[in-house]
Amino acid sequence: MKGSYKSRWVIVIVVVIAAIAAFWFWQGRNDSQSAAPGATKQAQQSPAGGRRGMRADPLAPVQAATAVEQAVPRYLTGLGTITAANTVTVRSRVDGQLMALHFQEGQQVKAGDLLAEIDPSQFKVALAQAQGQLAKDKATLANARRDLARYQQLAKTNLVSRQELDAQQALVSETEGTIKADEASVASAQLQLDWSRITAPVDGRVGLKQVDVGNQISSGDTTGIVVITQTHPIDLVFTLPESDIATVVQAQKAGKPLVVEAWDRTNSKKLSEGTLLSLDNQIDATTGTIKVKARFNNQDDALFPNQFVNARMLVDTEQNAVVIPTAALQMGNEGHFVWVLNSENKVSKHLVTPGIQDSQKVVIRAGISAGDRVVTDGIDRLTEGAKVEVVETQSATTPEEKATSREYAKKGARS
């Protein structure tokens, strides 16, 4: 009796389980049939035409540039300081009280312009004394010459002795010597008076005054009255490695003036352009460099004494050089290389030999030719033979490009 009871319960449980399984089977079938049209449509719209449920990987976006053939100037660069062509400390040559200053601080002056005046009173007095002594001695000389003429007539008749005649002749000569000394004294006094008016010895810009009106000054003062710096023209002194000396000398022998450019501290703005003036006659053994001097007209006052600048000297121009953006040049274990795009926008690595380069462009001596397209941005995840999408350089990225970049970044992060 108990066995039959248990058998009935087993049968009931089996029937319930079968019913539940049948329900889930039919429910899943209906769901798959309702989803089938959408899945088929999605498979048809798949750009790769691959298996259902597979998505095509987005192409890596890159920026590219075309290698061009052009003339490339070769520059030697160095750090330098602007120096005045001449620097003069204006000092007084005479002692006295400073009566007046005839310049404005920072003013441009010409050679001969009056800068200052010393009290001339004592020099006028000294000049008058010298002139008076000269006049007196000239009168004495005139009288001595008249006496000599009389002595010469009397000597012919033996009315005066030869000794007296010689004595008178000596007196005339002595007085003539005194006259010359008096004339020198007059010239000296006149010079002292002239020096009481202090003039500019060179063209240039005056600095700040070093002494005020009313002070007693002397020729021994080391500070002077004012300093004049000649800034038209003005010089640039910079250094080059000793290895560049041969290049500079060879360029000088070509007979053409070497152009030197002065750039600001950040090397972003050209201040002025001049020419090479000279090389120093020895190398600094401590630094292994040589000093170079260039001269600039500086009519626009773009350069100022003691100003720090970056110097660039043009020594040669390379004709028909293959040039690419510097951003395209990469360095790996094999050496320098670039990624080159073919007509299908597939990339391949090319080993290259770089030449002259700066922050913007680089000359490629071997490895690629003019007209080749090279990748300049988006290089990080490129692989040999990969197909890429070339995008234009834009100042502002579009929303579509941002989405593509994010999707590609996610894929790269997962790989």
UniProtKB/Swiss-Prot annotation:
Compartments (UniProt record): Cell inner membrane
Keywords, alphabetical: Cell inner membrane, Cell membrane, Membrane, Signal, Transport
Keyword check for Isomerase: no
Signal peptide: 1-21
SUPFAM superfamilies hit by this protein: HlyD-like secretion proteins
Molecular function terms from GO: efflux transmembrane transporter activity
Record has Signal as a keyword: yes
Sequence ranges of Basic and acidic residues compositional bias: 399-415
Coarse class of the protein's main subcellular location: membrane
Upregulating conditions: The mdtABC operon is transcriptionally activated by BaeR.
Gene Ontology cellular component annotations, sorted alphabetically: efflux pump complex; plasma membrane
InterPro entries: CusB_D23, Multidrug-R_MdtA, RND_pump_MFP
Sequence similarity: Belongs to the membrane fusion protein (MFP) (TC 8.A.1) family.
Function text: The MdtABC tripartite complex confers resistance against novobiocin and deoxycholate.
Protein name stated in the entry: Multidrug resistance protein MdtA
Organism: Escherichia coli O6:H1 (strain CFT073 / ATCC 700928 / UPEC)
Gene: mdtA
